[in-house]
């Protein structure tokens, strides 16, 4: 597809049985490359706080940071659908804040949709944002903004009661108007059941192969996050080794006086 993707295109992919590909991006260069590769959706995740800014979790990320990174992504003019995360405290306090901050991500950042975490309890928030004509992608299961309540990054929905609650959450957010939902850190059979029962696309991350699409953090698939690699991450490259080699070679050549040579100098 040579034209810009929309939420309608993403939803049609589920109906057609075509898998949806999603990656995070936080800047211009990565966005340009992944868009040239044909990625379907780009997520400016609040994971930027961890993999880009070095925070321990996503909670410190601010609206201003999200807008900054969204602008950087949008400048690459990707054909992929651009979705921006709503960070912690940008939508939990009241509906007015939620609408205002969703609007900022679209108006000031250039996002085409927003993503927020939570199930049935955020249905009214989703509805309020959608009523402003801003598309919303939901996010249930392991929700990183809830790590203190969950006791860390733990798989959700293993017990029957939890499983039913997540299924109810999925149906509630669909009814509220979400155009898609991220399923994170849940058993693959539960993800399969939710995917079958929803008419909107499910995007899995640590949720098995039966979701309508998959999302991963770009730094994870490139091997740039040496400190922590979840079970569900597959590395498709070793950028850490490539960067280490390039930087080490640069340092060595400068120290030896080999760089710059005449070919990299002006006469």
Swiss-Prot record:
Q: Catalytic activity, per the record?
A: 3-methyl-2-oxobutanoate + (6R)-5,10-methylene-5,6,7,8-tetrahydrofolate + H2O = 2-dehydropantoate + (6S)-5,6,7,8-tetrahydrofolate
> Pathway membership of this protein?
Cofactor biosynthesis; (R)-pantothenate biosynthesis; (R)-pantoate from 3-methyl-2-oxobutanoate: step 1/2
The compartments listed are:
Cytoplasm
Q: Which cysteines are joined by disulfide bonds?
A: none
- Note on cofactor: Binds 1 Mg(2+) ion per subunit.
- Main localization, broad class: cytoplasm
Please name the HAMAP family in this protein's record.
Answer: PanB
Q: Which family does it belong to?
A: Belongs to the PanB family.
Q: What is this protein called?
A: 3-methyl-2-oxobutanoate hydroxymethyltransferase
């Amino acid at each position: 597809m040579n034209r810009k993707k929309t939420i309608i295109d993403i939803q049609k992919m589920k109906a057609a049985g075509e898998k949806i590909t999603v990656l995070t991006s936080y800047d211009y260069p990565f966005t340009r490359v992944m868009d040239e590769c044909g990625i379907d959706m780009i997520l400016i995740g609040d994971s930027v706080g961890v993999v880009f800014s070095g925070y321990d979790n996503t909670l410190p990320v601010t609206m201003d940071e999200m807008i900054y990174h969204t602008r950087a992504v949008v400048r690459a003019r990707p054909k992929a659908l651009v979705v921006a995360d709503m960070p912690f405290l940008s939508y939990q306090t009241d509906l007015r804040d939620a609408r205002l901050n969703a609007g900022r991500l679209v108006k000031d950042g250039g996002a085409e949709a927003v993503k927020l975490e939570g199930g049935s309890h955020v249905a009214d928030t989703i509805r309020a944002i959608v009523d402003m004509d801003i598309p919303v992608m939901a996010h249930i299961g392991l929700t990183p903004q809830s790590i203190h309540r969950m006791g860390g990054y733990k798989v959700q929905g293993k017990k029957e009661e939890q499983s039913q609650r997540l299924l109810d959450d999925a149906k509630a957010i669909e009814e509220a108007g979400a155009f898609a939902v991220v399923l994170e850190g849940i058993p693959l059979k539960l993800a399969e059941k939710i995917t079958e029962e929803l008419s909107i696309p499910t995007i899995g991350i640590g949720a098995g192969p039966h979701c309508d699409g998959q999302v991963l953090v770009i730094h994870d698939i490139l091997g740039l996050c040496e400190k922590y690699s979840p079970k569900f991450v597959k590395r498709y490259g070793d950028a850490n080794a490539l960067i280490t080699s390039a930087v080490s070679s640069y340092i060595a050549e400068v120290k030896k006086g080999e760089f710059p040579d005449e070919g990299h100098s002006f006469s």
